[in-house]
Amino acid sequence: MAKPDIHPKWYPEAKVYCDGEVVMTVGSTQEELHVDVWSGNHPFFTGTQKIIDTEGRVERFMRKYGMSESQGAGGKGNAKKKDEK
């Protein structure tokens, strides 16, 4: 048997919102759930290709590690500096 007063409140009619509109009703421990992607607009289920991530992985990597476009991969930017000295 479940112990009393230790379980979270259960909402059997919790509403799921995507882009401000209700897309489905589920059971949850929260009254409202806000999601960015659900099966109705996910590219795998709709068969369409949609870019969800606005910033590419390569650009994010370059920005994170402070690499500029001129340096490129493999440290080619540093080889020119050695030749100049």
From Swiss-Prot:
It comes from the Bacteria. Residues 64-85 are annotated as: Disordered. Keywords: Ribonucleoprotein, Ribosomal protein, RNA-binding, rRNA-binding. One of its GO terms (biological process) is translation. One of its GO terms (cellular component) is ribosome. NCBIfam families: L31 (TIGR00105), PRK00019.1 (NF000612), PRK00528.1 (NF001809). Part of the 50S ribosomal subunit. This is Large ribosomal subunit protein bL31. It comes from Acaryochloris marina (strain MBIC 11017). The lineage of its organism: Bacteria, Bacillati, Cyanobacteriota, Cyanophyceae, Acaryochloridales. The gene is rpmE.
